[in-house]
Amino acid sequence: SSFAGLPIYDDTNNCRSLAFGYSPERINPGDKEHKISSIIKVTSGNTENVSYWVDYLYSSIIKAGTHNAKNIKVAEAAKVIENTQRDLNIALINELSIVFKKMNIDTLDVINAAETKWNFLPFKPGLVGGHCIGVDPYYLVHKSEESGYIPNLLYSSRSINNSVADF
């Protein structure tokens, strides 16, 4: 089996001698504030020992620290939901932008007003950027359906963001 494209090896695969670690990419190219040295690194391994050594290696070079995930599936799922959450938030603001336009309200004016509350997340309407933000939700959709659940919200957000160019 796999999650996010990475085969999962365990004792049932007769790969007891295979050791590998996993640490999802978390950088944002071009972002001058959030550099690799200031982003906590999620680490994992296919065994507890490998996980320890992967975490030890990254903790020696990442100043912000590390988070040693329980296993590779947890680390992979964390990466997928980071991007899926961003996709969902962009879909929300894109849909609100369509609604506000029909109501003759400037979306950016609304966002500027809403930003005055400390816990508002100021997403801007537009296309989803990055090479994985628009793709990772489909991995989660696939694994959800494989597990017997239809993730309607994920389908809706992808539909909204895929059609934003029409508006």
Q: What do these predicted ranges mean?
A:
Residues 84, 98-100, 128-129, 156-160:
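Conserved short loop/turn motifs at secondary-structure junctions
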Residues 2-23, 27-120, 143-149:
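Internal alpha-helical scaffold of NAD(P)-dependent oxidoreductase catalytic cores
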Residues 85-89, 133, 161:
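Aromatic-acidic/polar surface patches that form glycan- and anion
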Residues 96, 132, 140:
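Conserved hydrophobic/aromatic pocket- or pore-lining residues that grip, position, or stack substrates
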Residues 136-137, 141-167:
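ATP-dependent carboxylate/acyl-activation modules
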Residues 122-136:
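Conserved phosphate/anionic-ligand binding catalytic regions in large, soluble enzymes, centered on
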Residues 93, 124, 151-155:
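Short beta-strands and strand-loop turn motifs
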Residues 116-121, 160-164:
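A short structural micro-motif
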